Structure formats: C-alpha cells, structure tokens
C-alpha cells in the first residue's frame, strides 16, 4: 500500500515493503536451530513497557494506520480494525478478521484471530482498555504513539527488528527521511497559509501543526497553519470560519 502525504507540497511516498519472518538455518541439530530462529526480541513500547515477541505469525492491529505500517513493514495481519478497510482502503486478504471499529473493538473477534502479537495505539482509549485483558491472557501487545515522521521511523525500526529486515528500515525509513530533507530544501520561502482537514466517517476536523504527520510536514515546509491558535477552526469548524480565514491551500486526508 502506498500513500501520498500532502501531494502539492511533498512528493514522497511510504513505499510498501515485503518483509519475511526469521527462519532457521539447516543444521544437524534441528531443535537448536529452531530455538535460535524463535529467540525472543524485546523492546520498549511507547507506554514504557517491555514487550517480547518471537517471530509472530498471527498479528492483530487495533487501528488502521498501524495496520498500514505493519503492512508497509512487510508483515501480514490475521485481524484488523474496521477503518483498515473503511478509511484506508487497504488491500487485505478475504480471510482477515474485522475486529470492529477503532472506538468499539470486538474482543471476541480479536481473540478469534488467535493473535500472538497485538499492536495498539497509545492515543486510543479503547485500545488501552484492552491491555489488561491481553496481558492476563499472555498475548504480547505493544502500544505506539505515531504523530510524526520520527515516530513512524521508530515504529518501523522496531517492526524491522522483529522481522530481521534492517535493509528495509533503510530503504523505507532512512531513505525516505532523506527525500523529506531534500523536499524541505526546495521550499520557496513563500510561507503560504494552509488549512489541514482530517476526515472520518462521522466528522471533519481541522488539525494544527503538531501531533499529526501532515501538520508537521506542512510546518517543515514553512507553511502557516491557520488552525494553530484558531479556536473557531480547531474546535468549531464551519464553512463560514473557513471562508473567513481564506487559506491559500486546503489539504484533506
């Protein structure tokens, strides 16, 4: 899956990755080789929790953007939340289980996928509410906070550590970071006024320069986000408020 962020100002794409799990090398001692291949990888998630996984084969993602990141890391999912299809239109196999909406995850559906690794969001309370249940069942679960490209890099780094494909971290992380730096250098210094709108099935909200990927990209390019410090836009969005602000560009995701 490829997604453009802010097409008018930044021509970079999160490129899809093909990633494979660790496999054991042939040896006379098959048991020992299998143990090496299944060695635990331990990392710290964005809640400060230590999480250990061993080549997970059945991954469930609790928000669509993390489904995307896991797929972009070359992983596969056995279960994913509804917005993986509804909002992101990800091309998932027919046998992937829909585990419910982001704010209303279905625990029964999640468990029916028989997950050996679950990925959730720090910023989504419905994800956090399930953490204790996952832990009590002995299912490894990690929570990430991805609101900017650096956060994406951090998560990608962990995902490629899990799969052992650090070449893909360079190709789809560090190389993209360089593309961003090159794009920033090309900014003409005109500092256009912009409005960034994020849409969902039930709402449209104006987003500022911080706490979201697109807002940070626009800020890096020298754009002035009219939602920054503008309560009429950020808290009570209306067509009248947009027309009054009169931005040069409007970006919608």
Regions found by a protein language model. Name each.
Residues 2-8, 22-65, 166-197, 246:
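Bacterial Sec-exported substrate-binding components of ABC uptake systems
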Residues 11-20:
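Bacterial N-terminal signal peptides
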Residues 45-47, 96-107, 230-239:
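Short helix-initiation/N-cap motifs at beta->coil->alpha
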Residues 49-50, 129-203, 224-228:
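Extracytoplasmic substrate-binding proteins
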Residues 65-68, 83-86, 117-126, 146-151, ...:
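Solvent-exposed loop/turn segments at secondary-structure junctions
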Residues 84-89, 206-235:
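Alpha-helical, coiled-coil/dimerization segments enriched in small aliphatic residues
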Residues 107-120, 139, 239-252:
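Proline-aspartate-enriched helix->loop->beta-strand connector
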């Amino acid at each position: 899956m490829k997604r453009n962020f802010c097409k008018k100002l930044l021509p970079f794409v999160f490129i899809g990755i093909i990633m494979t799990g660790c496999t054991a090398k042939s040896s006379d001692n098959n048991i020992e080789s299998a143990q090496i291949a299944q060695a635990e990888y331990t990392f710290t998630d964005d809640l400060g929790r230590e999480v250990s996984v061993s080549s997970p084969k059945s991954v469930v993602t609790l928000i669509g953007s993390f489904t995307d990141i896991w797929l972009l890391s070359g992983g596969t999912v056995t279960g994913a939340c509804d917005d993986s299809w509804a909002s992101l239109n990800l091309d998932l196999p027919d046998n992937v289980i829909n585990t419910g909406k982001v704010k209303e995850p279905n625990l029964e559906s999640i468990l029916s996928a028989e997950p050996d690794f679950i990925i959730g969001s720090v910023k989504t309370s419905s994800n956090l509410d399930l953490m204790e249940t996952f832990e009590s069942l002995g299912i490894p679960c990690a929570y990430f906070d991805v609101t900017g490209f650096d956060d994406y890099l951090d998560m990608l780094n962990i995902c490629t550590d899990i799969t052992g494909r650090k070449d893909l971290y360079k190709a789809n992380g560090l190389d993209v970071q360089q593309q961003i730096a090159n794009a920033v250098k090309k900014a003409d210094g005109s500092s256009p006024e912009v409005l960034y709108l994020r849409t969902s099935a039930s709402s449209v909200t104006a987003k500022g320069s911080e706490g979201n990927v697109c807002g940070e990209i626009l800020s890096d390019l020298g754009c002035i986000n009219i939602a920054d410090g503008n309560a009429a836009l950020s808290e009570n969005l209306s067509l009248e408020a947009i027309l009054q602000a009169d931005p040069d560009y409007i970006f919608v995701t």
